[in-house]
Amino acid sequence: MNVRGYEIYSYKSFPYDLYKGSPYYQKQKKKKDPVRYRCMLMAFDIETTRLPEIDQSVMYVWQAAVNTSVCVGRSWKEFKRFLNRLTEGMPDNGRIICFVHNLSYEFQFLRSVIKFDDESVFMPSGRKILRAVAGKIEFRCSYLQTNMSLDEFTHKYGVDYAKVHGFDYDALRFPWTPLTDEEMEYIVGDVIGLTQALAAEMHADGDTLNTLPLTSTGYVRRELKANMKEYPLYLLKKMQPPLYIFQMLNEAFRGGNCHANRYYSGDILENVHSVDRSSSYPAVEVIEEHYPMGPWKLET
C-alpha cells in the first residue's frame, strides 16, 4: 500500500536490510555514557478505541516510521516482533531513539507489553514520561521536547505531511476492523509528519540525534552555557553567597502571590482584565544594565 508516496509495510514485509548498515553517531566528548545512537529517525504512535462499558481503551492499530519507511500492525505481538527484527544484530551499547508525541499516554500501554529498564524511566514531574528504555530502543517524548502539539509542530516547520484533520474518534474500531484508505492516511500521517518536523528542527538548529535536547528548556540551558563561557569560573564562584546567607535567602523568598485589593474585597466585578509579566525575575536580570553582581560583602 502507498500513501502520499510512502510505502506502507507490515512487520513481515518491512525492509529491515535497508537499515542494517545504518551508522552510529560518535560518542560525545566528556560523556561517560557508553551508549551510541544509531543514525535513524524513528517515530511511533497508536490509535485506540474507548470501551465505555469497562472504562478502558484498547489499541486497534500501531504505526512506526523509520526514516522514509512506515510499518503498520494491528497487534502488540506484531509490534514486539517488529522491534526484535529492527534491533537484530545491534551491539550491546547500540540504541535507536524512537519519538512518541505524548509518551506518557503510550507508555501506559507499552509498559504491559515490553520490559522497560526501571532506572531508565525519567519522569521530570508528576506522571509525565520524558524518556524510557526498553532493550535497544530509547523512547522519548517529542511533546516535551518541543512543548507544542503535533499540529503546531508540523505547521511550524511546514512539512509535506502536516497533521490530517477530520478523523472520527468516536467510531468503534478493533484490531480486526478493516481500515479505509482515508483512515490509513490519517493513521500514518502523524508518524510521517513527526519525523519530517523533527528532521527540519534538527536541520534548523544544527543538531543531530546525538545533540538534540531532551526538552524545550534544554535549548535555553545550552545557549546559556555557551554565553557563560566568556565569564571565568572563579568570578562566578565568587558571586555565590556563603551557606548561611543562602539559607536566609531561601527562608525569605516568596513569590507567585495573588492579593485582593482591599477596596474591592468581597465584591463581584465584571469586565475585568489582567496583565502579567512573564518570567519577570530573569527578565530584570537580563534587561537591567546595572543589575547588582559581585562578591557578597558583610557590612559592619
Task: Enumerate the predicted regions with their spans.
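N-terminal accessory regions of nucleic-acid-interacting proteins
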Residues: 1-42, 46
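Cross-family signature of deubiquitinases and ubiquitin-like deconjugating cysteine proteases
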Residues: 4-7, 60-69, 98
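Common nucleic-acid-contacting/processivity interface regions adjacent to the catalytic cores
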Residues: 5-17, 21, 52, 172-174, ...
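Gly/Thr-rich phosphate-binding beta-strand-loop-beta motif of the actin/hexokinase/Hsp70
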Residues: 31-63, 272, 279
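Short coil/turn segments at beta-strand junctions that form active-site/ligand-binding loops
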Residues: 38-40, 91-96, 269-271
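Anionic group-transfer/hydrolysis microenvironments
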Residues: 45-49, 102-104, 108, 143, ...
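Short secondary-structure boundary/capping segments
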Residues: 57-61, 112-119, 285-298
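Conserved DEDDh/DEDDy metal-dependent 3′-5′ exonuclease domain
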Residues: 68-179, 185-193
